[in-house]
């Protein structure tokens, strides 16, 4: 199975650009989010238990120590010698600019770290942060700003307690473009109340804004979340694998050649997962996506 026959994958992009495989190393810098700390709300997104989707990152130790530990784990199973530091947990631009710079500088100080991937919310990227990231990019580092949108529908964003709007996302994208930053947008399929058509609409709206890359995830119902409580009450229908695969295939078929796919699914930590069970089987999902592309 060679998905790169049909999909412009981020991994292949990095391999072609740098002449070798580049791997991401997750970092937890102990950030929070404005919809968790009371600024915009409490409790966070209704689907979010951060341990479930960034289990490899921990709060133990400095950025340097975390990167060293992650690199040691990766080098046991991968051939990668150079890496991108992935600030993944919560909103990694939500803080004082001095603290952000110190953390990012610490990550980039390691010779094997070629760049940063910064996961955050569209309402947490003021211009000084964008300027800082643009400065790193101009120095030759591989910089990616990953904006968690999840849906372009404000009713859905409210439903999952995101605490921001699609207009916030549009504003963030336009300002990031002004600074020349590489943008990746996260989308979730299976949000309660949404259909496959809604996911395709969100995808098209992201494309229309000139974003360079996307990540697509099926909705995970994980322990310790508001969504889990609703699911147990029968209020959240399970997303089927067929619906997910068919929608992803449709997205890939209609994608511009230059659009990068950073991820086509997400598996998370199995010990937290309640539903749907099929998301545990990453390679089955990717195989079904590949088969759908071949048969098309």
Residue ranges of each PLM-predicted region?
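Conserved C-terminal portion of the radical SAM core fold
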Residues: 167-226, 242-265
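Core AdoMet radical
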Residues: 51-70, 74-97, 112-125, 142-168, ...
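N-terminal [4Fe-4S]-dependent radical SAM core
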Residues: 1-84
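Generic structural signal for well-ordered alpha-helices
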Residues: 64-71, 100-105, 130-134, 170-173, ...
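Short amphipathic alpha-helices and their capping/turn segments at secondary-structure boundaries
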Residues: 71-74, 125-142, 200-210, 253
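Auxiliary Fe-S-binding modules of radical SAM enzymes
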Residues: 2-12, 18-23, 213, 221-296
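Acidic (Asp/Glu)-rich catalytic clusters
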Residues: 74-76, 103-111, 131-142, 174-178, ...
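Hydrophobic faces of well-ordered beta-strands that scaffold small-molecule active sites
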Residues: 23-27, 83-88, 116-118, 143-147, ...
């Amino acid at each position: 199975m060679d998905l790169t026959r049909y999909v412009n994958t981020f991994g292949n992009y990095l391999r072609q650009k740098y002449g070798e495989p580049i791997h991401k190393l997750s970092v937890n810098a102990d950030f929070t989010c404005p919809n968790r700390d009371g600024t915009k709300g409490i409790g966070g997104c209704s689907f979010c238990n951060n341990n479930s989707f960034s289990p490899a990152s921990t709060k133990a130790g400095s950025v340097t120590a975390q990167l060293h530990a992650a690199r040691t784990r990766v080098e046991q199973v991968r051939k990668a010698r150079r890496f991108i530091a992935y600030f993944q947990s919560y909103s990694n631009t939500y803080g004082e600019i001095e603290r952000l710079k110190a953390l990012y500088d610490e990550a980039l100080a390691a010779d094997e770290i070629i760049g940063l991937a910064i996961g955050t919310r569209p309402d947490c990227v003021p211009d000084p942060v964008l300027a800082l990231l643009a400065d790193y990019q101009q120095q030759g580092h591989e910089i990616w700003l990953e904006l968690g949108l999840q849906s372009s529908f404000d009713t859905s964003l409210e439903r999952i307690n995101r605490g921001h709007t699609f207009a916030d996302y549009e504003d963030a994208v336009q300002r990031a473009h002004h600074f020349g930053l590489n943008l990746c947008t996260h989308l979730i399929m299976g949000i309660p109340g949404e259909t496959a058509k809604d996911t395709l609409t969100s995808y098209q709206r992201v494309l229309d804004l000139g974003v360079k890359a996307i990540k697509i995830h099926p909705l995970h119902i994980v322990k310790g979340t508001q969504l889990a409580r609703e699911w147990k009450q029968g209020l959240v229908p399970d997303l089927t694998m067929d619906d997910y695969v068919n929608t992803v295939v449709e997205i890939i078929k209609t994608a511009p050649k230059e659009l990068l796919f950073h991820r086509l699914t997400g598996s998370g930590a199995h010990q937290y997962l309640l539903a749907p069970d099929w998301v545990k089987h990453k390679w089955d999902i990717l195989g079904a996506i590949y088969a759908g592309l071949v048969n098309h």
